Amino acid sequence: MRNLISVGGPQQGVFGHLLDYGAYETFIQRTDPNKRKEYQRKNIFLTDLNCETTCNSTYKNNLLKLKNFVLIKFLKDEKMQPKQTSWFGFYAENDTNTIIPMEKTRLYQEDLIGLKTLEKSGRLHFLSINGEHLHLPPGVRNNFKLIFYF
């Protein structure tokens, strides 16, 4: 894979009251800033992928092979809480009023999966779309192909 475009993806997980009903079932994996220990114990996907419990160097090595990693956030997104998760941001622990941007996270600062290296080398891109979750204006997909595939 040369380029990875994540369109409104929950990089740091999602949070919200609807997820209270089965947050740690095998088909639902939410990130709860108020129950961080439980999240780290029961979430079998993001804790591994984002090096929150252990770190698999293969994840970093594979990400660093990318020519471009594009993170797209929807500015009017009400499905993803917080919408900054699309750019690896998330709520502060035990504080759903404060958003920690990617640059202030351990994941970035310690370069656990290669985000810092990608950004410093100009291969990590942040795009925003003035719309609701996954509502792409006409022609946007083709613009992404032109910018990042050639």
Where would I find each of the regions flagged by the language model?
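Surface-exposed loop/turn and secondary-structure junction residues enriched for glycine/proline
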Residues: 31, 52, 90-94
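Internal, well-ordered interaction modules that form the hydrophobic cores of assembly/scaffold domains
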Residues: 9, 45, 50, 55, ...
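Active-site nucleophile elbow and catalytic-triad environment of alpha/beta-hydrolase enzymes
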Residues: 35-60, 108-113
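Generic surface-pattern signal
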Residues: 20, 51-54, 149
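Serine-dependent carboxylesterase/thioesterase catalytic core
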Residues: 1-41, 79
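Active-site rim elements
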Residues: 15, 26-39, 54-58, 129-139
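C-terminal catalytic-base region of ester-bond hydrolases, centering on the histidine
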Residues: 59-150
